[in-house]
């Protein structure tokens, strides 16, 4: 049998053998060093180098992740602060509304939004009642139509907030048009609104008012002439 532990006097060793076989004590693959506690440790040179390299790479990667995360948090805080400063300067810049109407107006507008959501829900109009026949009314069809389900809650909320805080509401619209929406889109829907509302509804309303006024004037004049003729004949 091959003895890897050299010749040892078994009578003196009491069964104890060296920790490292003799053939490996001078190997370049292993190293022995003393740690601060005074204990000696045996380590593989190549394994230690690989673990140290892997540990350094992992620490470097974690450090990059930490720096990236801190950078993202800092950028997010800057963006939030920018939004706050912008809102104070361009939207919530009316002290009287900020003190008295913005908060209650916002809460009531939120309630209006929920009310609109309830109004456009088909089940709230009795559509799921199976005991009695259900016949949809015109108002129900109008409220539960697809455009109403999309727009009605938002329209009610916007109208309510505009009633309570008109200047802040207008500032919000201006900020959205100037800084969020594309200029071409804003110009396009302004032209469309002008054509439909101002040149359409308002113009027809004024024309109808003028026609009614002219008709009334003619009728009054005719009635006065008839009355004058009757008085002359009398």
UniProtKB/Swiss-Prot annotation:
Localization: Mitochondrion inner membrane
One Gene Ontology biological process: positive regulation of protein oligomerization
Chain's role: Component of the MICOS complex, a large protein complex of the mitochondrial inner membrane that plays crucial roles in the maintenance of crista junctions, inner membrane architecture, and formation of contact sites to the outer membrane.
GO cellular component labels: MICOS complex; mitochondrial crista junction; mitochondrial inner membrane; mitochondrion
Transmembrane domains' residue ranges: 101-120, 142-161
Family indicated by similarity: Belongs to the apolipoprotein O/MICOS complex subunit Mic27 family.
Key word Signal present: no
Mitochondrial intermembrane side: 1-100, 162-234
Effect of disrupting the coding gene: Increases frequency of mitochondrial genome loss. Partially altered shape of the mitochondrial network with condensed, fragmented mitochondria accumulating at the periphery of cells. 20-40% of mitochondria exhibit an increased inner membrane surface and stacks of lamellar cristae disconnected from the inner boundary membrane.
Organism of derivation: Saccharomyces cerevisiae (strain ATCC 204508 / S288c) (Baker's yeast)
Subunit organization: Component of the mitochondrial contact site and cristae organizing system (MICOS) complex, composed of at least MIC10, MIC12, MIC19, MIC26, MIC27 and MIC60. This complex was also known under the names MINOS or MitOS complex.
Superkingdom of origin: Eukaryota
Keyword annotations from UniProtKB, A to Z: Membrane, Mitochondrion, Mitochondrion inner membrane, Transmembrane, Transmembrane helix
Topological domains, Mitochondrial matrix: 121-141
Major location (coarse): mitochondrion
Keyword Cytoplasm: no
Record-given protein name: MICOS complex subunit MIC27
Recorded topology in the membrane: Multi-pass membrane protein
């Amino acid at each position: 049998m091959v003895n890897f532990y050299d010749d040892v006097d078994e009578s003196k060793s009491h069964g104890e053998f060296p920790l490292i076989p003799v053939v490996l004590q001078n190997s370049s693959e292993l190293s022995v060093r003393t740690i601060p506690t005074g204990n000696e440790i045996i380590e593989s040179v190549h394994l230690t180098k690989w673990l140290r390299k892997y540990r350094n790479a992992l620490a470097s990667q974690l450090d990059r992740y930490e720096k990236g995360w801190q950078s993202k948090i800092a950028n997010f805080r800057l963006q939030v602060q920018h939004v706050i400063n912008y809102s104070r300067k361009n939207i919530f810049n009316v002290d009287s509304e900020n003190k008295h109407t913005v908060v209650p107006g916002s809460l009531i507008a939120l309630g209006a939004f929920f009310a609109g959501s309830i109004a456009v829900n088909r089940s709230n109009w009795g559509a799921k009642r199976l005991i009695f026949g259900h016949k949809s009314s015109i108002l129900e069809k109008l409220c539960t139509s697809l455009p109403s389900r999309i727009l009605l809650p938002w329209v009610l909320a916007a109208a309510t907030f505009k009633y309570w805080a008109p200047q802040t509401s207008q500032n919000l619209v201006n900020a959205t048009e100037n800084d969020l929406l594309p200029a071409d889109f804003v110009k396009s829907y302004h032209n469309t609104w002008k054509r439909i509302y101002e040149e359409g509804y308002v113009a027809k309303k004024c024309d109808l008012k003028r026609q009614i006024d002219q008709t009334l004037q003619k009728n009054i004049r005719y009635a006065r002439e008839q009355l004058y003729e009757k008085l002359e004949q009398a």
